[in-house]
A protein has these predicted regions:
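Short FAD-binding loop at a beta-strand-to-alpha-helix junction that anchors the flavin cofactor
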Residues: 1-3, 165-185, 192
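FAD/FMN-dependent oxidoreductases across multiple families
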Residues: 127-169
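Hydrophobic alpha-helical segments, especially N-terminal targeting/anchoring helices
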Residues: 60, 162-163, 189
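Generic recognition of stable, solvent-exposed alpha-helical segments in well-folded globular domains
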Residues: 14-17, 119-126, 155, 168, ...
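Short, small/polar residue-rich loop motifs at catalytic or cofactor-binding pockets
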Residues: 52-54, 154-156, 182-183
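An anion/pyrophosphate-binding glycine-rich loop and adjacent beta-alpha core
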Residues: 27-142, 199, 203-205
Length: 207
């Protein structure tokens, strides 16, 4: 990894304070041992390469070799963690730096890609312009993110252990969103936040 503590796609303020406070209050935590990593543009602390790889970009090492077939039978279509493994291994074995190469993407697809780069990452296009990177002619250097809070699968996260009412083993303490062990992803964060708030209000009204 880069050694930069905030080299993740998570908000820099997301430092686990909620889980820590809950633990000190006596709440149980679950799945904390799971971490996740991803491949990120060098010095741009946000994920954003799925669009590139999904349209045909490939990871290459400093020798210009496309290497993902060495790490998974599906190559670039393999699981994200295999991409991380591949990038780390290439760098550790002296074949870095590693690049995302978009030169093989069809011209029309390249235009679409560049036009939509900033849809969910406002400064992504600025990043390329300021570094003078033309994705149609120049491979982009990538790195691996730091380890982030993860979970055993894409649905189940890690954090404060909750029940169906978003309650914990501490009476009156409720949790939702990324701080809870069952609420990974945006829709789960929204619905669990609403439900946890309602259940907390019911608890207060019963006192």
């Amino acid at each position: 990894p880069s050694g930069m503590s905030f080299n993740t796609w998570m908000c820099p303020a997301d430092t686990g304070d909620g889980e820590a406070m809950s633990l000190r209050a006596g709440a149980e935590l679950a799945n904390i041992e799971f971490l996740r990593m991803t491949v990120v543009p060098r010095s741009f602390n946000a994920a954003g390469l799925n669009a590139l790889s999904g349209m045909g970009a490939v990871l290459i090492n400093a020798k210009g070799e496309a290497f993902m077939d060495r790490y998974h039978p599906l190559g670039m279509k393999g699981p994200r963690y295999k991409m991380v493994q591949g990038v780390l291994n290439e760098m550790r074995e002296g074949r870095g730096p590693v690049y995302m190469d978009c030169r093989g993407i069809a011209p029309e697809a390249q235009k679409h890609l560049i036009a939509t780069l900033s849809c969910d990452k406002d400064s992504f296009k600025d990043y390329f312009e300021q570094l003078g990177i033309d994705l149609t002619t120049t491979p982009m250097e990538v790195d691996t993110s730091e380890g982030m809070q993860g979970g055993p699968n894409e649905v189940c996260g890690s954090g404060v252990k909750i029940n169906k009412d978003c309650g914990t083993n501490v009476p009156g303490l409720y949790a939702g969103g990324n701080g809870a062990d069952q609420c990974r992803s945006l829709h789960m964060a929204v619905t669990s936040g609403i439900h946890a708030g309602r259940m907390a209000a019911h608890y207060c009204a019963s006192l």
